[in-house]
A protein has these predicted regions:
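Inter-helical loop and helix-membrane interface segments of multi-pass membrane transporters/permeases
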Residues: 1, 47, 160-173, 344, ...
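Hydrophobic alpha-helical transmembrane segments
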Residues: 5-13, 27-32, 58-61, 92-100, ...
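Juxtamembrane and boundary regions of transmembrane helices in multi-pass small-molecule transporters
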Residues: 7, 128-134, 138-140, 147-217, ...
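Transmembrane alpha-helix interface/packing and boundary motifs in multi-pass membrane proteins
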Residues: 15-24, 101-110, 142-153, 412-418, ...
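Membrane-embedded alpha-helical segments and adjacent helix-loop junctions characteristic
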Residues: 28, 32-35, 39-129, 190-198, ...
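Juxtamembrane helix-boundary/capping and inter-helix hinge elements in multi-pass membrane proteins
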Residues: 72-75, 85-90, 123-135, 162-175, ...
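Generic detector of multi-pass transmembrane helix bundles and their immediately adjacent loops
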Residues: 469, 475-578, 585-589
Length: 591
């Protein structure tokens, strides 16, 4: 075997390890892989960067803008008015009413904003009707995933595969070509959740309340009295800025709340200082002359709803630049003008100094910030804001109409095959821009450039796997394992490998990695690769067994108070169900 083969195989294995272990961001890993393949002369410059001009990547970028228009205009928020009834009925009826609309909408647009809008709505509705939100949040995430399997534009994974098919000399998938597998899978998957799966979900207390109760254990107030030697000095001068194990996040002066606190803020007699940190270090601080511990005072997060400062919850996204950094080095306060007062991971609060905590994807942050924080950051890709009391800022009704019309125009042109998909998406975006439905800032926020880098890099990696012989080598192993059962055995092998990978790394990366292997496997047994690639598309999106496998799973992980085990209990049977149905349908339609 050649140098290129061994070099590519080693780089390929290291790439998977780095992505699964989240050593650095996925987009950095994949782009670095392309550069290393280029350095090793496995691929040419043209092959390395062909993905940056691929129609699949460009289409995804345009679809981000269309989804952004639906999100920012408040069109998606209208879904809330339809799916939540006023009366309290049995949980199966409620799941019916919620999940089917979610799956339908997710079939035609990015499911992240759909779930982001529904999380606070479900929590608020559940609190009013005495339901447990944890009975609904995982089902909503799964419904969004199932809906995305039904059409070409339902998920970016399908569009990556569409672009790779064209790059490999094939005709791309049609808008509804995947539907004959996706729709039956979605229907049976939803019925499983509604009648069977939800019984395995826990009935957790509303997560915001849990965080509030835990926060009371670690937040205390100290009052400045006459004996304090640093009255009229700044926080920095008083030595309260860089305390070991403590953080001064707020000052209450008469009826005024000062938060976040700045190093230059002066301290005055009678100020109430709010510290968060480990109890033993707080008790050490109270020994300072002039700082009186207010034992009977209660830190109540809900008191801020009517003030200039209020609490927020945010879930760290899988592509966040905060991942791998501790809170201190992340400059969170300076970057977002908000203070972290608690961090929850895997359903429990992390009991250490906040500044030393290394942030991970899925962490739930309890924040204090000013009232405009939500408006400024609700569409950020760094974290998902899930504050119950907030609603998405709405736009005039005519802009809601424009955003919905843009999606309708795209679907009309694609269904009738009047224009190529990228051109149809471009026309829809022109409509949005011409009517100023989105501002320049909103357009930038709508486009997830990290995802686009992953997608563009995927084409160079796929080319490297193919030209080096690594894809053919792995494909041979799959063929040897499944050829006794014919084509269906090989497809099953591809489905299993893809399902395993997609539950521990992003579905986009999984699709890009497995595509050249799938293509090579079909060539080796001399059959049409199309059904194999459709199987890959379904398997790459079928991310149910872990919370880290899909962005919507990650979004509901913290707010639902779930553990890893909760996802596995409902998600693993779903994973098996989807695979079995897909294999049966592939056998029926293609083999």
């Amino acid at each position: 075997m050649s140098f290129e083969f061994w070099y590519t195989l080693i780089i390929f294995i290291l790439m998977i390890i780095f992505i699964i272990r989240e050593i650095v961001e996925t987009e950095i890993v994949m782009f670095s892989t392309v550069i290393l393949l280029l350095v090793g002369k496995v691929i040419t410059i043209e092959q390395a960067f062909i993905g940056f001009s691929n129609v699949g990547m460009l289409t995804i970028g345009l679809l981000f803008v269309i989804a952004g228009a639906l999100h920012y205009s408040g069109a998606i928020a209208q879904l809330n008015n339809f799916i939540f009834g006023r009366n309290k009925s049995v949980i199966t009826k409620k799941l019916f009413r919620i999940l089917f609309p979610v799956a339908t909408v997710s079939a035609f647009m990015n499911n992240t904003p759909v779930v982001a809008i529904l999380i606070p709505a479900i929590r608020s509705w559940a609190e009013r009707t005495n339901f447990s939100p944890s009975k609904f949040l995982i089902p909503v995430s799964y419904a969004a995933i199932l809906g995305g399997m039904c059409t070409l534009i339902g998920t970016s994974t399908n569009l990556i595969i569409y672009g790779l098919m064209i790059d490999f000399g094939m005709e791309g998938l049609g808008l509804f070509e995947i539907s004959k597998l996706g729709i039956p899978i979605a229907l049976l998957g939803l019925f499983y959740i509604i009648f069977i799966g939800h019984h395995s979900l826990p009935e957790h207390k509303e997560s915001f309340s849990m965080i509030e109760e835990k926060t009371r254990e670690f937040v205390l107030q100290l009052k400045i009295t006459n004996e304090y030697p640093h009255i009229e000095k700044t926080i920095e001068e008083a030595g309260l800025r860089h305390l070991q194990g403590l953080f001064l996040f707020q000052i209450q002066r008469n009826n005024q709340i000062i938060a976040p606190t700045k190093p230059t803020q002066k301290l005055k007699l009678g100020d109430r200082l709010f510290f968060t940190g480990l109890p033993k270090t707080i008790l050490e601080l109270q020994k300072t002359p002039g700082l009186e511990l207010l034992k009977d005072s209660i830190f109540d997060l809900k008191q801020y709803d009517a003030s200039m400062v209020r609490p927020y919850e945010a879930v760290i996204s899988a592509s966040s630049p905060l991942i791998g950094k501790n809170v201190r080095n992340s400059k969170f306060r300076e970057q977002y003008n908000a203070v972290i007062i608690a961090i929850h991971r895997n359903g429990t609060r992390i009991k250490k100094k906040i500044g030393d905590i290394i942030l991970q994807s899925g962490d739930t942050l309890l924040l204090l910030a000013e009232r405009d924080f939500y408006r400024q950051w609700y569409a950020s890709n760094d974290f998902y804001l899930i504050s119950q009391s907030e609603v998405v800022p709405s736009k005039p009704r005519w802009q809601v109409f424009v955003s919905v019309t843009s999606l309708g125009l795209l679907l009309f042109l694609m269904i009738l095959k009047l224009l190529p998909m990228v051109v149809a998406a471009g026309l829809a975006v022109i409509l949005i821009l011409a009517t100023r439905t989105l501002s320049a800032y909103e357009i930038r926020q709508s486009i997830d450039f990290r995802v686009l880098i992953i997608i563009a890099s995927a084409f160079g990696i796929a080319e490297g796997l193919r030209s080096s012989g690594v894809a053919e080598f792995i494909a041979q192993a799959i063929v040897l394992a499944g050829e006794s059962l014919g084509s269906i055995g090989v497809v099953t092998g591809i489905f299993i490998i893809t399902s395993l990978l997609t539950n521990f790394m992003t579905n986009n990366a999984t699709a890009a990695i497995v595509f050249p292997i799938t293509f090579a496997a079909a060539q080796q047994i001399h059959v049409d690769p199309r059904p194999f690639i459709i199987a890959l598309a379904i398997a790459a999106s079928a991310s149910f067994a872990t919370p880290i496998s899909y962005q919507t799973n990650l979004m509901v992980y913290g707010p639902g108070g779930y553990t890893f085990k909760d996802f596995f209990k409902i998600g693993f049977p779903m994973q098996i169900l989807v695979m079995v149905i897909a294999i049966i349908l592939l056998q029926l339609f293609y083999f």
